[in-house]
């Protein structure tokens, strides 16, 4: 009998996650910062899309034609449901990579893989590389994220032990969640004996504690597949060489801000390394990199300084956060750093009204603050990297995408009546997903249904909870009466009206 799972965990679904780096709209800022030409994105593909939330949000929030596959039929079925509801140009399948590659597919401007590279066999990696070689256009971009060495070097033996316990000791027929719990309990008991391994690697105990608190669906796919291969950057480069790809830049904007990631001594050391690929490998040792999120390009083309500056000034942004809640702290590999208030505050104050502005308009508006263009670029990178600002699509794209985003968002908000699994909605303004918890989605649904006041939104949500016997948990205790629930929801609704609603309206979600 053929094992259609190829050693991949398939008896438990993956989490309903959204990964903003998969949004092609984010490529342009990263590429321009790296002085690279970015393509216009008309066709895109996601390989191993999981539950398909990212693929569907990106298809509904843009005019890009999306294709993708995930071999798990239950996950693909859910993804197809969302695509049907939105009516967006999304073609999602439940096929293995080699089957999918045989389809009559277009050439793609963009191909994305989030995480799966680390969890599949070398055979499947070869299939993916061949697919990229054939289907990624010249000038096209690959986004790929993967577990990285040396950061995973210490924990890899412990992961091997946990999976062996689940395989050898875990009882057949009890399911992967029980086997994971058993493996974690066993690991804790082992560490309690103070083995020399944990003395040599003192951070292992804390790592196991962190893992115990994580979603079991996530752990099943992150740690308990048959194949699990963290990889050095240089090894990844060797894999992608047959597809004619070269490294472009990190998809994680904060990686480009060296001051929060590397000491002055480390920055000076890296400057003496002239090979860009080897430089990345060395940098991974400096930051003990565990997970890379990278853009690769088929045929990199460099911009002149003038072309770079002109293109950057054309980029449009808006603030998606509530200004009083924005922190001037940022976390990099070196830990927490404080942002320079005299540089960041003028930009934040200007953008607090959630209006869309080009970088040129921002530059002109804050010119009296003495902020240089280089400082402004870094400010925007940091604020986009921490979710305070977002890139904005052109008006024609926003207009075309809105009807599909509206349909998908209504469907997701209706699902929020019964559970909190899906915590993102689509914005035609940013071309991607926006995080929004269950109650906030239900407040937005109440507004969509014509309710005007926070008190009305709260009553709407309280009725939904009461009909299902659901209670709000506050400070660890359930609220017992409907009056208590309504009071809590009313308080949350008033806060929502002040903190979230203005941004959601600017994002054209509400």
Set out the residue ranges of the language-model regions.
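Conserved SAM-binding strand-loop segment of SAM-dependent methyltransferases
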Residues: 87-97
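Conserved alpha-helix/loop element of class I SAM-dependent methyltransferases that forms part
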Residues: 7-42
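Conserved beta-strand signature within the Rossmann-like core of class I S-adenosyl-L-methionine
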Residues: 139-147
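Short acidic, hydrophobic short linear motifs in intrinsically disordered regions
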Residues: 356-366
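A short glycine-rich, Lys/Arg-flanked "PGG" loop and its adjoining helix->strand segment in the class I
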Residues: 126-138
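Conserved class I S-adenosyl-L-methionine
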Residues: 146-170, 183, 189-196
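Conserved SAM-binding loop of SAM-dependent methyltransferases across substrates and taxa
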Residues: 51-63
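Short, amphipathic alpha-helical interaction segments positioned at domain boundaries
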Residues: 398-449
């Amino acid at each position: 009998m053929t094992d259609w799972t190829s050693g991949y965990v398939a008896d438990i679904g993956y989490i309903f996650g959204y990964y903003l780096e998969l949004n092609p709209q984010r490529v342009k800022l990263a590429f321009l910062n790296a002085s690279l030409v970015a393509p216009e994105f008309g066709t895109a593909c996601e390989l191993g899309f999981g539950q398909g939330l990212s693929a569907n949000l990106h298809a509904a929030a843009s005019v890009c034609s999306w294709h993708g596959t995930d071999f798990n039929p239950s996950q693909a079925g859910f993804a197809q449901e969302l695509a049907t509801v939105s009516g967006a140009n999304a073609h999602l399948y439940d096929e293995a990579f080699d089957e999918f590659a045989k389809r009559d597919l277009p050439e793609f401007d963009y191909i994305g893989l989030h995480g799966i590279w680390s969890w599949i066999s070398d055979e499947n990696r070869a299939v993916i590389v061949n697919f990229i070689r054939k289907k990624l256009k010249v000038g096209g971009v690959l986004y790929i994220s993967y577990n990285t060495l040396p950061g995973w070097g210490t924990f890899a033996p412990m992961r091997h032990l946990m999976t062996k316990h689940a395989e050898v000791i875990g009882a057949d027929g009890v399911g992967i969640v029980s086997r994971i719990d058993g493996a974690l309990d066993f690991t804790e008991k082992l560490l309690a004996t103070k083995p020399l391994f944990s003395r040599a690697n003192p951070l292992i105990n804390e790592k196991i504690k962190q893992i115990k608190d994580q979603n079991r669906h996530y752990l099943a796919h992150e740690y308990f597949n048959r194949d699990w291969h963290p990889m050095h950057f240089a090894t990844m480069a060797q894999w992608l060489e047959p597809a004619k790809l070269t490294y472009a830049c990190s998809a994680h904007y904060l990686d480009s801000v060296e001051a929060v990631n590397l000491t002055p001594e480390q920055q000076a050391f890296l400057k003496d390394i002239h090979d860009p690929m080897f430089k990345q490998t060395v940098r991974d040792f400096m930051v003990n990199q565990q997970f890379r999120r990278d853009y690769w390009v088929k045929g990199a083309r460099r911009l002149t300084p003038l072309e770079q500056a002109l293109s950057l000034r054309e980029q449009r942004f808006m603030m998606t956060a509530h200004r009083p809640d924005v922190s001037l702290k940022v976390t990099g590999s070196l830990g927490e750093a404080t942002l320079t208030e005299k540089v960041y505050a003028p930009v934040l104050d200007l953008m607090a009204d959630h209006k869309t502005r080009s970088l040129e308009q921002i530059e002109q508006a804050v010119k009296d603050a003495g902020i240089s263009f280089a400082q402004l670029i870094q400010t925007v990178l940091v604020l986009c990297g921490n979710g305070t600002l977002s890139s904005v699509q052109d008006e024609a794209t926003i207009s075309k995408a809105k009807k599909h985003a509206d349909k998908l968002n209504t469907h997701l908000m209706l699902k929020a009546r019964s559970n909190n699994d899906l915590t993102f909605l689509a914005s035609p303004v940013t071309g991607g997903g926006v995080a929004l918890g269950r109650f906030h989605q239900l407040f937005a649904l109440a507004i969509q249904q014509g309710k005007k006041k926070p008190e009305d939104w709260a009553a709407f949500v309280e009725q939904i909870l009461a009909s299902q016997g659901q209670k709000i948990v506050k400070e660890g205790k359930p609220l017992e009466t409907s009056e208590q629930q309504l009071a809590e929801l009313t308080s949350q609704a008033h806060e929502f009206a002040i903190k979230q609603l203005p941004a959601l309206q600017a994002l054209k979600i509400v």
